[in-house]
Amino acid sequence: MADGNLLGSSTSLTALLPTPSSASLSASLSSSSLPVSPFLAPAPTTAITASIASLSAQPPPPLPATPATMAGWIGWVFSFFFQFIPSVLYSVITFTTITLPTWLFTLFSMSLTFTMNFTTLLLILLAVVSTLGWFVRYRFLNMYSRLPPEPQRKEPQIDLFPDVQGGDSKPGLANYLDEFLSAIKVFGYLERPVFHELTRTMQTRKLIAGETLMLEEEKGFCLVVDGLVQIFVKSTRDGKSGSDDELHHLGAESSDEEHHIDGKQGYQLLTEVKNGASMSSLFSILSLFTEDIQVWDSQSSTSSSSSIAMRAARVPDSTPNSPRGGMDSPTPIFRDVPDPVSLVNENGDLPLVPPLHLEESPIPPTNHAHDRRQHDHRKHHGRKHRKSVHPDIVARAMVDTTIAIIPASAFRRLTRVYPRATAHIVQVILTRLQRVTFATAHSYLGLSNEVLGIEKQMTKFTTYDLPNNMRGTALDRLKDKFIKERDRLGTEEVTKGIALHNPSAGRRRRSSSFMRKDAVLHAKMMSPKRAATVITSDNSYDHDSAGVSPGDLLSTIQQSRFGPRYEQPTPRLRSPLAEKENSHFRLPAMQARNAFHRKESLDEDALFRECILDCIMKAIGLTSSTGEVLRKSSHSGEASPKLLSYDSRRQKAVFSNNAFGFIDPYEGSGDGETESMMSMSVTSAGGTSPVTSLREELRNDIEIVYFPQGSVLVEQGERHPGLYYVIDGFLDVGMPVVDKGEDLVGVSKPATAREPFPTLKRTTTASSIKPSATAANDPRRRKQSRKSLYLIKPGGIQGYVGAVASYRSYTDVVAKTDVYVGFLPRASLERIAERYPIALLTLAKRLTSLLPRLLLHIDFALEWVQVNAGQVIYHQGDESDAIYLVLNGRLRSVLESADNKLTVIGEYGQGESVGELEVMTESTRPATLHAIRDTELAKFPRSLFNSLAQEHPGITIQVSKLIAQRMRDLVERPVTEKGAERSSAGGVQTATSTLNLRTVGILPVTAGVPVVEFGNRLLHALHQIGVVNGVTSLNQSAILNHLGRHAFSKMGKLKLAQYLADLEEKYGMVLYIADTNVNSPWTQTCITQADCILLVGLAESSPSIGEYERFLLGMKTTARKELVLLHSERYCPPGLTRRWLKNRVWINGGHHHIQMAFRLTAEPSHPETKRFGTVLKQRVQVLQAEIQKYTSRRIRQTPLYSAQTPFKGDFHRLARRLCGRAVGLVLGGGGARGIAHVGVIKALEEAGIPVDIIGGTSIGSFIGALYARDADVVPMYGRAKKFAGRMGSMWRFALDLTYPTISYTTGHEFNRGIFKTFGDSQIEDFWLEFYCNTTNISKSRQEYHSSGYVWRYVRASMSLAGLIPPICDEGSMLLDGGYIDNLTVDHMKGLGADVIFAVDVGSIDDNTPQGYGDSLSGFWVAFNRWNPFSSCPNPPTLSEIQARLAYVSSIDNLERAKITPGCLYMRPPIDAYGTLEFGKFDEIYQVGYKFGKQFLEKLKNEGSLPLPEETEEEKKLLRTMAPRRASI
C-alpha cells in the first residue's frame, strides 16, 4: 500500500512539479530503497523503475501556446531549448548510469538450480544438435536449391513473313515492263546502251487462245509478256526430223500421251510458259549470238595427217545447228593463198541486203566466179541447216497471249557493235547453261554420257600437233632433262609433277596499272604515226608485214585498260582481195618457221613454250576466226564508211566498246582510264609497239610439266586449274564409279570433294570416314573405282570447256603413261577471255553445235527462276507442278500444324532439290517452301518429267532412287519425332540447318566490334580447315574496287547480284563482313546474301540490343542467326551468356565463345613508358603478371591446349561448325565405369583431335560437362577425381539414407557433390557446346538440355531410379537419360557433327539361356544360388528384371548408333568394374587412357583418323599451280 501511495505521489508530483525536481525526487526514492531486504527489494525496485521509465517515456511538458508576435516566437524557442532538451539528456544519463547497472547487478547476483535425469538431458542435447543440424543443412548446405530460377531457353519462333509477291499472273499489260525485265534477266547485267540496242527492234505479237506458233520458224528471242503458252516438242517416235539421227542417245521411243497439233501426231508437252518467262532456251540465245562465229579454223593445217583427218570428221548430222557449209568434202588448202571467201561464208553468209543497211553484211566483192558459186552453194547449204534456233519446237497459246520477239538481227548487230558486252552476256549464259542444264542433266538426271560426250567431241576442234622440228630429237632432249631430275628426286617426290625451270618466270607480269599507263602513253605518242600508216599504200603495208610472225602481230595492238592485244589491225582503205593477199594469219608451219627464225638465239625450252602457246591459241579460236570477223567489219565499213564512222563515235561517247576494230581509222585512241568497263579499242597496223604484248606475257606463263604414270592432274568436282596441252604421252579422262551398294543412295548422299559439282548435297555429314589422300592415289584402288571415258593423245588439249568457261570438272584426269604437258594457268585464260571476246564466242558456237537433242529439250523446259528473300515459292496444300533445284541461295521448308505452329522440316542449299515426291505421286505440297535469301532456282516442270519418263525411263529410275532414299530417311526419323525432340530439347539446331552453308554474314552487335579482324581470323581458319573449292571474304572496299562507284546504286544492283552469284559458285564459302555503318547499302547486302549471320559482340560490354541488331530485325530476314561472344581471356563468368541471350529471341542457331585478343583503347602504360623509360615498363609488366597469377580466378590454359594443337583453336572450331565438319564426342552412362571417359578424352587430346560438340548421358554428362566447361583435360581430371572421392565415401551414403518410399537416399549428398563441382554455372557459359539427355517420366519421352543450370540437368541425367529421387523441372520428373538412349549419336548427328567419337561404358547384361520351366519357386532360386554343384544358371532377380525392362529401348538405340555413318564406336574393357566403384578412380582411368591410345593409333594406321593435316591434304586439288621447280 505504501508502494502504491509512493507511486501515486510520485505521479502526482510529476504532474505538478517541473522536470528537474521530479527527477531528483525519483532519484532519492530509488536511493533510499537500496538497503531494503533482498527478498523485498525486487518489488519496489521494479515499481520505481517503472515510474522512472514512465517519466522518461512521457512526452515533454506542454509548450506554451504559439505566440503571435516575434518576441513571443523567440521566447517559445528559448523555453523549448531550456526545458525539453535537458530533460531528454538527463533521462538517458540516468538510465545508463543507474538503471542498467542495477539490472546487471541483480541478474548476476541471482542463483538458479535445475535438477533433471540423464534421459532428459540427452533428449535436450539431441534437440539442440538436431536444430543446429537442420539449420546448417537447410540454410547453408542447401544453397543449390535457392538459386534464382533460370528456365530453359525456348526454341525461337520461326519467322515466316507474309508473301508480298503478287504471284505468277499480273493483270493486263500494266506491268509490261516488269514482265519484260524479269524475262531478260537471263542476259545478266546490261548497260543502258546495250539494253537499248537489244530492244529497239523488238516486236510484239498477239496470239488468240488455241493459236499455234511454229518456233522453228522464229529466228529470235521469244518471251511471254501476258498470257500462258504451252511448249511442245516433236517426239522421236516419228524419226523424220532432219536432226533426229541421235536416236542412240534417246532410249525408248514409245509415247502414250501425245498431243495433236495441226492434225499431226507425235508432239509432247515440254513446259508451260507464264508471264515474264522466256520461250527460248539458253542454247537458242547462244545460237543467236554466235551465228557469225566459225566452229574451227579452216585455214590451219598441222603437220600431222591424223589431226587433219580428225578435224575432217565433222559434227554429226544429229546436232540441230551443225554448220556444214562445204565441209562434207574438205579440199586441200594452199598454204600461201588462203581463200577469204570461204572463210567469210563457211558458216553461211547473211542474206543480201542493200549496201547501206547496218544490220547485215553484203557479199564481199570477188573476182573469182568459182568462189562465188562455191559461196552460193555454201550459203544455201548453211541456210538449210541454220533455219532455226528452236528445232522441233511448237508453241500453243492456252489463253489470249501477248509475246515479244527480239529478232536475230538485233543479236547480230549487238555482236558487231558491242562485242565486249556480247562476250559478257555469253559468259553469263554459259555459266547458267552449266549450272542449270549441264549440272541438272549430269548430277540429277544421271545423263553423264550426254554431258561428257560434249567434252569428248570438243577434242576434234582443239587438236593441233607440234611442228615436226619440235619432235624427235628435240623432244628426246626434253625428256632427258626430266628423267635426270626424276632420278635425283626419287619417285615419292614427283607425284605432283616436275616443272621445267622457266628463267623468265621471275619477270612475268608487271602490275596492271603500270601497263595501262604505259599503253596510254604509247597510244598518245604513236597516234600520228598510226594515222599515217593506215593511209599508206599497199607496198608499205607489205613491207611492214613481211616476215611477220604471230608474236610480232601481237605487239602491234594497243594495250589499253581492257584492250585486246591479239587481234589483227584493221586497214580500212583496202580491198578484200589485197587484204587476202597480205593476211597476217599465216599457217602454223609458216608461223613456226618465222618464230624459230626470230628466236634462233633462244634455247629449245623457250621454243617449246612458244609452239605450245601457238597451238593453244589456235585451239581456243584466236586465229582465222578473228581475221574473218575483222574482214566482215571491213566490208561493212567499205559499204557505208560515213555511217560506220558516225556510229563508232556515237558508241564511243555513250558506251565505248570495240573488240574487233569497229572504229573509224582516223579516230584517235582515247585515254584508257576514261573508257567504260566494257570498252576496248584497237590500234591500226604499222610498226611494232614497245608495250609488252599478250603473247610475250603468256609465253612466260606456259609451264612444261612432267607427270609420272598414275598422277592425278584434275579431280572430279575441282575447278579446272588451266589448260593442259599434251606434248607426249596419254591422258586418261574418266569418272569414279559408285559401288553397287551405294548406288541406291548415291544421289542423295552428300558429295565429297571428289564428287561432281554441284551435286544434290555438297557438304557432308555422312561421308566422315573417307580414305586418306594417299589411298585416293593408290593405282589399284583407282582401277577398281574408276571408269575410263576417252584418251587425250599428243596434240590434244584437256580442260578447254572447263577452263575457258570456268566450269567445274565432271571427270578426273589421270596420266595414262608418263606424260609431258604444257600448262597454261586459268588466270592467264581469264585474261585472254577478258581481252578477246572471240574466245568465248568460239566456245559458245562449238557448244551449240555439239549439244545433243535430249539436252536441248531439257534446256528448253528448264526455267531459271529468281526469288527474293522471304518470298514463298509454294504454300502447303498447293498443287505440285515442278521440282525445284537450288542453283544459288537457300530455301526452307516449313510445316504448319493445325494450331498454327510452324515446324522446320529442312533447309536446302546450293545443289539440292525439293519436290520430287509430290511430282511423282501427283500429290499436294506437304509444306510451305520459302526463300531464306535471294535465291536462283532451276524449275523442272512436271510436264518435262512426264515427257522424259516416257522416252527415257532411266531418268525416272534415277529420280526414284532419290525419292526412295528420302522415304527411308523419313521412316527412320519422322518429321513429327524431330519436331517433338527439338521442342523438348531446348536446342534450336536442326539436322539440315548446318548443312551446305555457302554464305556467312559477319555483323557486329554495335559499333566498335572488331569484325574485320574477326573475319580475317575466321578466313584464315577456314583456309587451314580446307573448305571444298576454297573460301573468300568480301568487305565494302573489295566490292567497290571490283564494281566501281555504281556498286550499290540502282543501276549496279543486278551487276552486283551477278558478281556475288559468280563468287558463290566459284568458292565453297563466301564471308560477307559488314564493316560499314548501320544504314549503308553494304550492310544490307551482307544481311540479304547470308545463309547464316554471325552476330559478333564483346562479352565484357553491355548486353543491350545494338543498332545493327535493330537494323537486322527491320530487314525481316529469315536466315539462321548465331551469336558470337568475344572474350579477352579464355573464361566466361557464370550467367554472362544468359544475359546476352535473354532478350535475343531471334538467335536461332546457337552461340559461340571465342577468345580473341583485342584492344579498343590504348594501353594505359604507354604514357608512363615515354616519361619513365623502358625499365619501368618492364617492371610493371612483370609485377602485373605475377599479381594476376595469384589473384585471378580465371583458369589459365596450359600450352598443351593452345600451342601444340593449333587446330583446336576457337576459330577453327567455329570454322568446322560452319562447314558442317564438326567433331562430336558422345559419352555414355555406366556409373563408376564412366571414369574411363577421362582417360579417353586425354588420349584424344594427345592425338591432336579437336572436339567441337559434347553430349553425355548419366556419368557421361558429368564428365562431358567438365570438359566442355574449360575445354581442357587438366581441370577436368582434378574435378572428376574429387567427385569420385565424395561418391566413394560410404559415410556420406549412409548419412543420406531415408525411408525408401521413392528412393533409398534423399539425394542431398549427391546434389552437393555435383553442385560443389559446377557451382552456379550454366550450360550456355561452357566454352564448348554441350547437351545432356534425360528421361521425362511425367510425359514419357526423352529430353535434351542445352541451357539452364548445369548441376540440375547433370544431376537429372544421373538420377538412377530407386537410388536417387527424380528431379523436378517445370512440373515434370526427370530421370537418367540412359533409360531411353544411353549413347545419343543420333542427336549429335542432328547438331551437324561430321565425325562422332562414341564411348560406351554401359553394363552388359547376362544373356545366358534360361530353362527353369513354366513356373518358378523362390525357395529353389535361393537354394540354387548357394548350390555350387548346380548346373542351372541363376535366374535374374526382381530388381534385375526391372532394370532390364527399363533399358529395353536404350539397347535398340545403341545398336543403331553403332552403324551410324561417321560414328567411331569405342568400348573400353571396363566390364570388370561395378556401377558404384568410384574408389577405383586411378585404375579405371588408366584402362580408358590405354584403350584410347590403342584405338586412335589403330585408326591412324588405317588412314581413317580425321586429323586436320590429312583433311588439308585431300583439298590440295591444284596439282600444278605450285609444282616443284627443278633447275634443269
From Swiss-Prot:
Topological domains, Lumenal: 94-115
KW Aminoacyl-tRNA synthetase (keyword) present: no
Cytoplasmic side: 1-72, 137-1528
Pfam families: cNMP_binding, NTE_Ploop, Patatin
Superkingdom assignment: Eukaryota
Reaction(s) catalysed (UniProt annotation): a 1-acyl-sn-glycero-3-phosphocholine + H2O = sn-glycerol 3-phosphocholine + a fatty acid + H(+)
Transmembrane segments: 73-93, 116-136
GO biological process: phosphatidylcholine catabolic process; regulation of phospholipid biosynthetic process
SMART domains per record: cNMP (SM00100)
Regulation: Inhibited by organophosphorus esters.
Domain PNPLA: 1225-1389
Subcellular location as annotated: Endoplasmic reticulum membrane
Motif (GXSXG): 1256-1260
Function: Intracellular phospholipase B that catalyzes the double deacylation of phosphatidylcholine (PC) to glycerophosphocholine (GroPCho). Plays an important role in membrane lipid homeostasis. Responsible for the rapid PC turnover in response to inositol, elevated temperatures, or when choline is present in the growth medium.
PANTHER family: NEUROPATHY TARGET ESTERASE SWS, NEUROPATHY TARGET ESTERASE/SWISS CHEESE D.MELANOGASTER
Protein name per UniProt: Lysophospholipase nte1
Gene encoding the protein: nte1
